[in-house]
Amino acid sequence: VKSPRFGLNRFDSRSVDAFAADVRRAEQLDWDAALQPDSQLRRRDTYVLLAAAARATERITLGPLLANPVNRHPTVTASSIATIDELAPGRVLLGWGVGDTAVRLAGLKPARVGELEAGTRLMRALLAGESVEVGAARPARLPHHRPVPVWIAAGGPKTLRMAGGVADGVFIRVGTHPANIATAVSAIRAGAVEAGRDPAAVKLAAIFHTVLVDEPARALTMARSMAAGYYEYSPALFDPPALPWTGPDPETLKHDRNIWPDFHHAPDLEASGKAVDFLPVEAADAFSLRGGTGEVAERLLGALRAAPAAFDYVVLHPIPDPKWPSDPDNDYTARIAREVLPQVRKELEKT
């Protein structure tokens, strides 16, 4: 099994300088990618942060994960990411999707699959230096175009299939269960074939919510909240692993238990996890890695070995959200880098 490049998507964003320093620390700890959410009502401007990180680093891959075509027009995003690539040549990617929390918090609706597809085609053309008809007096062109790959983050079958047909790569966001991952990879490959593309040319990545909590009961509770978050937006993901949902509708639970904005982003993940204590352990383990570093490493290896294809990137999304300032020697960034990644890389080299 090929070892993927490991990415992190949570950094100290209390200031621009703090973000740049934290990404530099991640690079020194041998993380491969630093990816930043584009959520304007929760965090500082993504591209200002990435520009600062580009100046402070030499090797690590940088990019948004994820942007969307609702909060920023695709031409704006293409211009911004091309500018970042000027600062970090050849180590930038653009990760985007329909938009969930960032869009909903602004009172807007996530993009439709067709809108995301059109935006992807537009951005890839602009970043390749092509002229594109956009309904203006003249075709649009990006003077400072750069060859930045456009990745789509997706979990639903329609979006995955579309992504296989138009994107440079796909961040699969369906949890850790092999049945869901296999279903996602099949959809991506089918979309590539339909579009006349070589399926092997579409790069693959995975996003794994990683509950790094040493106390087993707390880790399980938070993992249940992660499972509920997936069900909340994509209930069909419970079908391939044949998992039950025997509780009330997620929206009813959120209202009755004061869970906001959703099960993935609730400030108190133990409280939100207890609200779905009817979920079996199998559901918790189908949508996240959990436990101490030893357990996380074992579960991560299992997920990678069971996957039907090799991943170029694996993003280990920290749960719960790190608190800043943190202990730089013992926080999530350091513990995963020191106690998980070397072991996983070594084991994968053997196979």
Model regions and ranges:
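N-terminal beta1-alpha1-beta2 module of alpha/beta enzyme domains
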Residues: V1-L65, V148
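Active-site mouth loops of central-metabolism enzymes
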Residues: P4-D17, A67-P74, H145-G155, T210-V213, ...
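Hydrophobic faces of well-ordered beta-strands that scaffold small-molecule active sites
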Residues: P4-R10, A34-Q36, T61-L65, V92-W96, ...
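Short, acidic/polar
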Residues: R14-A26, T77-S80, A154-M162, T293-R305
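Conserved, mostly hydrophobic/aromatic
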Residues: D30, A53, I84, M123, ...
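Glycine-rich, proline-tolerant flexible connector loops at the mouths of alpha/beta enzymes
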Residues: A33-A56, N68, D100-V103, V174-P178, ...
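Alpha-helix-loop-beta-strand connector modules within alpha/beta enzyme cores
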Residues: Y47-A67, N71, L126, A334-E349
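An alpha-helical appendage that flanks or caps ligand/catalytic pockets
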Residues: K109-R141, I181-A309, E347-T351
